[in-house]
């Protein structure tokens, strides 16, 4: 079951021009809204175009709830990275020029309360991949809140780079692995949602030949690990000339459910 109080920014990609009446009602109700940042100015304020010649501004101090310095301001690169991206915000005020003053920080504060009070280990959340590092993936799960997905939690089959499975902007479901509420740190896992060993193994039968991907070549252990699915790996005898990432055909020699093992032969 997906548990979500806040959609990730940009989960729903759409734009509908907004009227002043609509924005004023949203301001009164404290509604969380979404728009695309059209510009980051020289003071690192973010500008939103609502259509109908109506604009809004997210002042720099209202951009972030977490990633700020000792003065309460986010770093310039954080502000600049929001250009042409969907962001969530609340309408705080309207100035004498009819420009709406917005706050992304207020949404972030609400999302932090959700994380601290309601989000639990094992819950499934929607997320969007925001950045990829060699060690893992940063995923936004709602209201600007970001969790870390370590590379070893992406799949059972070992991979050398997260980009072999996920890409920036990809939308998917993730499971909460752990929460450090004191430091606002969330660890996610993806492999638990790719099926158990039994669920994956039932799609294969002894005596059949299928395609696999080489994931580990360990000559010392006299074996090559072959990915049949992201969450199902079999072991084949070592063979010269086989390299990581290579597509190979494998004969399924034996499936051993009680040991959760699959014996393969590279053909």
Regions found by a protein language model. Name each.
Residues 1-267:
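Single-stranded RNA-binding regions, centering on S1/OB-family and related RNA-binding modules
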